[in-house]
């Protein structure tokens, strides 16, 4: 590790194979916490390259516990986190909204590292038991249209660095990696990122994959569509900037999206959304993220049609029914 750190401290970049080997060694416990923290710090001080990101991703995918749910052609809706905004669990609520609209979802999530509550915190608050049992996940897909994968059960490297990430309490390149390494290798993904360089980095990375995708970034720094400002959506062949008003929504304040101070607070907001008793801002932010996810799967539909489908899922109670069935099946 010493030679690698010297190389990085001299402002050099890693080759793809070097990055791959480093992450494999981290997962195998070959470096101590100080060395790993030093490595992480380098990537807090400069942007990661495409080669480095792909190498780290290669290692995680090679070491993952594979899960074959390809027959469902599912979508994952996921953000990098690390935007410092402490929003409520927008992507998790969007996942159940999309599942309620009839589209299979496989959510890959974790505990919050830089926020009060990650997707796994919300699931735990509802009594969900995490599992790596593929048969159980397949039943969940068949009966609920959604399955949940708790990242540490499938990515040993993520588990190995979890205490270091929590101790640093700032975004790291592992925030960038999480959305890229869903063990299912879903057919579709809606990915949220916290800055424009990462939007382009993700777009380059996904263009060499078979995944049908969209990458979103709110221009005021959110790693999801927040309706607080203009936002950019990038797909394989297109980039477009949208405004909230252009899609029929109001423009909201940061405080409208606050996730609270505890996982219990975040779970309460999540429940209000599913019960269709949330604030207008909370509901509409979930709707717009769900709508762009639906459009990834159904590109023949206009975004206005996808917004209508997402709203209907929440307002009809189908999203809530999906959640209730999911909790019942997965709390045993």
Role assignments for model-derived ranges:
Residues 21, 55, 93-96, 163, ...:
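Alpha-helical scaffolding segments of alpha/beta enzyme cores, especially the outer helices
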Residues 40, 88-144:
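A glycine-rich phosphate/pyrophosphate-binding beta-strand-loop-alpha-helix module
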Residues 7, 59, 65, 87, ...:
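Glycine-rich anion-binding loops and their surrounding alpha/beta cores
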Residues 79-84, 109-115, 154, 219-220:
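Acidic, glycine-rich active-site loops and adjacent beta-strand->loop/helix elements
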Residues 38, 93-97, 285, 289-292:
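Short amphipathic alpha-helical face segments that pack within enzyme cores
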Residues 1-87, 101, 105, 252-257, ...:
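Acidic, glycine/proline-rich low-complexity segments that act as flexible tails and inter-domain linkers
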């Amino acid at each position: 590790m010493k030679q690698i750190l010297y190389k990085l401290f001299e402002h050099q970049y890693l080759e793809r194979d070097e990055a791959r080997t480093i992450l494999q060694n981290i997962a195998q416990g070959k470096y101590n916490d100080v060395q790993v923290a030093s490595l992480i710090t380098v990537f807090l001080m400069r942007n990661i390259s495409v080669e480095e990101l792909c190498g780290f991703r290669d290692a995680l995918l090679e070491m993952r516990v594979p899960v074959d749910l390809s027959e469902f052609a599912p979508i994952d809706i996921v953000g990098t986190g690390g935007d410092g905004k402490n929003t409520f669990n927008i992507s998790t609520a969007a996942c159940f909204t999309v599942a309620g609209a009839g589209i299979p979802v496989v959510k890959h999530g974790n505990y919050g590292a830089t926020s009060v509550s990650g997707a796994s915190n919300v699931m735990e608050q509802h009594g969900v038991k995490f599992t790596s049992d593929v048969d159980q996940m397949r039943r969940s897909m068949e009966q609920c249209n959604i399955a949940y994968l708790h990242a540490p059960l499938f990515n040993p490297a993520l588990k190995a660095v979890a205490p270091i990430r929590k101790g640093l309490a700032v975004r790291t390149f592992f925030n960038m990696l999480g959305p890229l390494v869903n063990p299912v290798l879903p057919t579709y993904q809606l990915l949220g990122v916290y800055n424009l360089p990462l939007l382009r980095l993700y777009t380059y990375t996904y263009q060499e994959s078979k995944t049908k995708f969209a990458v979103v970034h709110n221009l005021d720094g959110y790693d999801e569509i927040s309706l607080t400002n203009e936002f950019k959506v990038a797909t394989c062949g297109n980039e477009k900037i949208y405004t909230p008003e252009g899609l029929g929504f109001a423009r909201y304040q940061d405080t409208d999206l606050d996730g609270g101070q505890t996982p219990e607070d975040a779970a309460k907001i999540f429940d209000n959304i599913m019960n269709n008793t949330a604030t207008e801002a909370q509901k509409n932010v979930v709707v717009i993220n769900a709508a762009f996810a639906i459009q990834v799967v159904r590109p023949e539909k206009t975004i206005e049609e996808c917004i209508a489908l997402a709203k209907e899922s929440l307002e009809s109670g189908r999203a809530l029914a999906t959640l209730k069935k999911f909790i019942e099946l997965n709390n045993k």
